[in-house]
Structure formats: C-alpha cells, structure tokens
Regions:
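Register position in tetratricopeptide repeats
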Residues: 29-30, 63-64, 97-104
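Short coil turns that delineate tetratricopeptide repeat
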Residues: 48, 82-83, 126
Length: 131
C-alpha cells in the first residue's frame, strides 16, 4: 500500500512539472518573458539538467538583454552538448552582444571567444541557418 502511495506522489510531481513547463512555453510564445522565466526557473528546480528549460532561460535573458545570464545558460549547454551547433551559436551571440555593450578594451578581449563559438557552430552544422 505504501508503495502505491509513493508511486502516486511521484507521478503527481511529474505531472505538475510537465504542466509548469507547458505553461511556461505558452507564456514564452506570448512574449510574457517575466512570467515564463518564473515558471521555467521553478521547473529547473525539479529537473536541473533539462536542456530545453536552460535554453529557454538563456533566450529570455537575451530578450531582456541580460547577457551575463544568457552566457551562463548557453555555456552550460555547450559544455553539456558540445556537438550542438545551436548552443555554440547562441553562446557566441550572447558573448557578441555583451562585447558590443562593453567598453572597447573589454570587447577586444572577447572577440576571439565569439569567433571561436561561431566557427565551431559552423563546423558542427554547415547548414546552420545563421552561421
């Protein structure tokens, strides 16, 4: 009997987690980034390695021009999935935007990493739309 209760408890957590993610996706599609960010962050607590959730949080940070947060999220993804061209591309894009908004000396120090990220994305997927 106790095993059945534990099973249903775990199942309810799973259902709650999925519905949180789905709600967050809908909010993101409606460009309600602040609300979506809260739900994605909540979802990430229960599934800390969920790549799609991390990517959405990076995308939201990019929309909010929070380049440091976007970089942190995309860096996690490119390290965890080094053969995914899109993660390298997004990481390079966030770095490039941070460099653009930084002073010239700081930007100069970032250019090599931006270039490396874009070149890696292009090597991984020659048909990548934006590389």
């Amino acid at each position: 009997m106790k095993n059945i209760q534990i099973f249903f408890l775990l199942l309810s957590f799973s259902v709650f987690s999925q519905s949180t993610f789905e709600k967050a996706e809908k909010l993101y599609a409606q460009k309600k980034y602040n609300e979506a960010e809260k739900l994605f962050s909540e979802h990430l607590k229960s599934q800390p390695n969920n790549a799609k959730t991390i990517e959405y949080l990076g995308d939201i940070a990019g929309h909010q021009k929070d380049w440091n947060t976007a970089i942190t999220n995309y860096k996690k993804l490119k390290v965890s999935y080094p053969k995914n061209a899109n993660y390298w591309y997004k990481y390079g894009g966030a770095l490039g935007m941070k460099a653009k908004e930084s002073n010239k000396f700081k930007a100069l120090g970032m250019i090599d990493e931006v270039e490396e990220s874009f070149l890696t994305a292009a090597k991984l997927d020659v048909k990548h739309v934006e590389s």
